[in-house]
Amino acid sequence: MVKRVRFEAPLIHLIDEAVGRIKEHIRERTILHDLFFRERLEYPTFAWQEALFNAVAHRDYSITGACIEVWMFDDRVQVRSPGLPPPPVTLEQLQLHKSIHFSRNPLIVRVLADLGYLREMGEGIPRMFQEMEHYGLRPPEFSTEGFFFVVTLRNTPVYDDDTLRWLNQFASKEINFRQRRLLAFAYCHGKTFSTTEYERVAEVDRDTAYRDIRALIKSGIVAPLKPKSRSYRIIERL
């Protein structure tokens, strides 16, 4: 551990101070986008702030002598909150991007939502996954250690630099994280894919796969290999 900082303040001031200090330690990275090198933060801002705000909103305040902790490493950020997920919330639900409509501290949640710190109930966790996916990073990890609930964000890329550069050609298109994952898969497999492969890679049912593929066709990103085919090819920009 290089440095340890402790904050004690009313909740709103505590959040603002913690956000400011964390920002100081999140590095910028240089990426290639549309033939230009640009600076980008190593973690999406929404993801780590949502983890912090959720910790403040949902920690178990009956546990005394334990604080919310933010640990920053070279390869990851961890937000550790006293109190295990309260029933009916489970780690499995969180890891499956489920929208959770439950709060241990409803009054605190309402105040933080009114002040703009929290999203609508149930929106934050799915968007954390989307933001990490959009950055080409591994999905958020949820775990428990003793009586702490732990959220881990890693800065390790899911895709290699070549794949990320290729995906950048679709940056102006409205594609979701499932479609982005599928495009990366297709890039590494001859730039073609089938409906069955989409279901497996994106971990969705056939109806969702069909809707996503139709949206990609409508956007001019993919096209059937043959009329009425369930296999598709990527249409690249010139």
Where are these regions (language model features)?
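C-terminal regulatory or interaction extensions
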Residues: M1-L238
